Amino acid sequence: MPKRTGDILISTPVSKVRRKLNFDSPYTSRAAAPTVQGIKRRSWTYRPMYRKPRMYRMYRSPDVPFGCEGPCKVQSYEQRDDVKHTGVVRCVSDVTRGSGITHRVGKRFCIKSIYILGKIWMDENIKKQNHTNQVMFFLVRDRRPYGTSPMDFGQVFNMFDNEPSTATVKNDLRDRYQVMRKFHATVVGGPSGMKEQCLLKRFFKVNTHVVYNHQEQAKYENHTENALLLYMACTHASNPVYATLKIRIYFYDAVTN
């Protein structure tokens, strides 16, 4: 009889303890009988894939996106931005055409995930003032890029009283711009309770299929479909903050190149 790590059923004349036979099910118990306690017994995390339920095996995302081929390539962007109340934008899908591990082979590739690492901070003069400043980040997909540079924050988002925390994509641009992820970070200035910098560490799965034209340069104007943009804006009108970020994208080349 195979050995199992789950709960067992004990019903003998000596012991009248009845324990539920559920074999470490992560779902909520429906019985009132006492169960054997264990460490992290409600999770399937540390169990091999063939011993997980069928739901975990069927609906698992593929390692390589559909229509793409390996290896997984990496492109990094290191930048320092002056984040103002009016907002700033950076294109994070700029990849040069080439044969290296950081280049795209052809016109099409898929960005599977993005890693945003860094911090936001204030300079010596601003951090002495009593205020709280929040930086709003919007990871946006531009489905139909047009022009030599991305549209500004105020051109894409509709805000109440010019407040970035109330920003939503304008109605006439909703079919073009899609907000995929949104997050924020907070810094506090003043003599008491100062938090002059805030660390950022975010990892998102995006699965964005980017299409370029015949040009080789990594520019926004060479995109034809699905440019990935990062919009940033701070909530304080007069005190800007600085963002020192390292943005890394993980992408796969398309088979149809």
UniProtKB/Swiss-Prot annotation:
A zinc finger (unnamed) spans 68-85. One of its GO terms (biological process) is viral penetration into host nucleus. It is found in: Virion; Host nucleus. GO terms for cellular component: host cell; host cell nucleus; T=1 icosahedral viral capsid. GO terms for molecular function: DNA binding; structural molecule activity; zinc ion binding. A motif (Nuclear export signal) lies at residues 101-122. Keywords: Capsid protein, DNA-binding, Host nucleus, Metal-binding, T=1 icosahedral capsid protein, Viral penetration into host nucleus, Virion, Virus entry into host cell, Zinc, Zinc-finger. InterPro entries: Gem_coat_AR1, GV_A/BR1_coat, Viral_coat. Gene3D superfamilies: 2.60.120.20. A motif (Bipartite nuclear localization signal) lies at residues 3-20, 201-248. The keyword Zinc-finger applies. Belongs to the geminiviridae capsid protein family. Encapsidates the viral genome into characteristic twinned ('geminate') particles. Binds the genomic viral ssDNA and shuttles it into and out of the cell nucleus. Plays a role in protection of the genome from degradation, virus acquisition and transmission by insect vectors, infectivity, and systemic movement. The CP of monopartite geminiviruses is absolutely essential for virus movement. This is Capsid protein. It comes from Tomato yellow leaf curl Sardinia virus (isolate Spain-1).
